């Protein structure tokens, strides 16, 4: 049994987009940015009862290791430059989740010091409403983010086949 023997039925063919999107959606590493009471619900979501690890979601403490940021709570204008800096430190591709009424729309705080929705500063991919949203809502929002990632179009070209011989470039 050598490498040259035909593989028969054991060949997998897929597009590179599908393969990369499957890997990205199956390993979301969010950075937590808890600013208010929503952070408590985010911690509860990461606990054993909801077990985000089974979906490949592992919280990271460093923006350089994260590909998603969860903005949970009230964003003040004084905190906004810090959030932008953290977002810029994240590698591409990156996604933003707005968790809670305050992060989505400013909540009940209609004052000069509160940002009326984080989407004024960052491109938000998923909004999770509630004050504060329950852990089930955050889990649902992260699953919706996985669906969005699975359907993204990348800049990769054709399909690849595992088991195909690739000729060296001349």
From Swiss-Prot:
Keyword tags: 4Fe-4S, Cell inner membrane, Cell membrane, Iron, Iron-sulfur, Membrane, Metal-binding, NAD, Quinone, Translocase, Transport, Ubiquinone
Lipid bilayer topology: Peripheral membrane protein
Superkingdom assignment: Bacteria
EC nos: 7.1.1.-
Keyword 4Fe-4S attributed: yes
Cofactor binding annotation: Binds 1 [4Fe-4S] cluster.
Subcellular localization: Cell inner membrane
Binding annotation for [4Fe-4S] cluster: 37-38, 102, 131
Cofactor(s) the record lists: [4Fe-4S] cluster
UniProt subunit comment: NDH-1 is composed of 14 different subunits. Subunits NuoB, C, D, E, F, and G constitute the peripheral sector of the complex.
Family, per entry: Belongs to the complex I 20 kDa subunit family.
Functional note: NDH-1 shuttles electrons from NADH, via FMN and iron-sulfur (Fe-S) centers, to quinones in the respiratory chain. The immediate electron acceptor for the enzyme in this species is believed to be ubiquinone. Couples the redox reaction to proton translocation (for every two electrons transferred, four hydrogen ions are translocated across the cytoplasmic membrane), and thus conserves the redox energy in a proton gradient.
Record's protein name: NADH-quinone oxidoreductase subunit B
Species of the source: Citrifermentans bemidjiense (strain ATCC BAA-1014 / DSM 16622 / JCM 12645 / Bem)
Gene that encodes it: nuoB
């Amino acid at each position: 049994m050598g490498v040259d023997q035909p593989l028969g039925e054991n060949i997998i063919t897929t597009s590179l987009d599908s393969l990369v999107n499957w890997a990205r959606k199956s390993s979301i590493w969010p950075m937590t940015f808890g600013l208010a009471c929503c952070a408590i619900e985010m911690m509860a979501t990461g606990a054993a009862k909801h077990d985000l690890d089974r979906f490949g979601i592992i919280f990271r403490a460093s923006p350089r290791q994260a590909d998603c940021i969860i903005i949970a709570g009230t964003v003040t204008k004084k905190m906004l430059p810090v959030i932008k800096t953290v977002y810029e430190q994240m590698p591409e591709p990156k996604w933003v989740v707005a968790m809670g009424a305050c992060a989505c729309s400013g909540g009940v705080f209609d004052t000069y010091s509160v940002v009326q929705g984080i989407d004024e500063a960052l491109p938000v991919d998923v909004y999770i409403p509630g004050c504060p949203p329950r852990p089930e809502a955050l889990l649902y929002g992260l699953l919706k983010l996985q669906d969005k990632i699975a359907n993204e179009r990348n800049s990769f070209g054709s399909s690849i086949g595992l088991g195909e011989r690739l000729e060296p470039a001349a």
